[in-house]
Amino acid sequence: MMMNRCEGQTRRTQGTQRSIVVGLCLGVLCVLCVERAAGAQEPAAPQTVSPAQLQAAIAKLGDLDYATRTNASRMVRRTASAQAVPVLMQAVSEQADGYVRYRALVLLTGFNDPRTKDAMRESLASPNDRLRTVAYSFFEHNPDRAMVAQFMSSLDKEQAEFVRPALVRALASVAAGAQGDDVGRARQALVREVSRGEDFFRSAVIEALGDYKAQYAFDALTAVAKLDGPLQDDAALALGKIGDKRALDTLAAIQRTAPRPAQPAIATAICLLDVNCESHQSYLVDTLKFSDKNPGFQELLRAAAAGLGALAVAGHAEAAQALVDLGVPSKDPTRAPMSLALATVALRNTPLTMAMLEKHPGRENAIVLLAEGFDMLEEDLDKERFFAFTRRTYWESPDNLPRRALMQTLIGKLDF
């Protein structure tokens, strides 16, 4: 959805067509400009800017130049809420550029303003896939039982590749609430989706059910886990996340027969059930080391990195530490899956990530690894939530605390 850092670097080095020398000079100046802005001292509080400056920044949110759009987002994020929110809401409704509307909607979520919910409800009906994805992601993090009927209606017709998984997660989030007729219908719909449709969408359903500890889907997930196929590892991991130890018999059985690429997910699931966790985590670490030294095991590598990521999200700090320890000195193709897993941990268990980085002796290199993972993630709303948390923590922390220095470093390295 967003350009990755490599694309951004390419954009930053593009100059005019007049000469290679001029192009290179302009590229260097752009890089220096972005690095200087990112590395500058963060303001101690939200700022007030002129209305013209704010409007100009919003208009540049979709600029092709990396430095321009990054600095525009940076200005909007640091503007006082009372000034920024009305202008962002206007942009979401009225901007002619669909990508600018999308970026404005994402930035709006960082201000924690109650009016954001109205903008999200309206965006659910937008023909713009990006806006609908952001809106469903918002309701995942802000579940509203009043939206269940609308979500279920959308479930029967929404087929956009990035939108449907966000819709499923929003429905799974509200289904995790207290039982009631609306929640019951949502749960029935999600269980039905486990065995219906394309594998890509079924995988998203299975993951969401695991993430939201959907005990009600235990039997459906167990049935999928027992079948050889592309969804076996997804279902096994979901059972581990749910935490019902009845799953142990199934997991132990498929551990003996499942193909090698599925083994990391099964080991992770058993660890999540608090059974032989140390040995299973060691297996994941050893698998990463093996895959690093022996090319050709990329699928196994991705599975092991994702397994450590899942353990870290569940609160296993040593798993996050292993991703950093192995990831920092590594090179691609080993490095990318570990940086992606670390970034996922940062989004889904931000307190654990912050605590680890705050006391890590190699913080700078760990944050570089994290930044690479952020560039690969497409969850722009979740990243914005992380950015907002980081800024608030910076503003609220006393000058002399290590946490404030960490926030400053994150803001600079992650270009926000």
What role is predicted for each listed range?
Residues 1-39, 44:
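Intrinsic disorder/low-complexity segments
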Residues 41-48, 67-81, 90, 99-113, ...:
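Structural detector for internal amphipathic alpha-helices that build alpha-solenoid repeat scaffolds
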Residues 8, 13-16, 40, 46, ...:
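Intrinsically disordered, low-complexity regions enriched in polar/acidic and amide residues
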Residues 56-60, 64, 87-95, 119-127, ...:
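Alpha-solenoid HEAT/Armadillo-like helical repeat scaffolds in large eukaryotic proteins
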Residues 42-64:
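Short N-terminal segments immediately surrounding and downstream of signal-peptide cleavage
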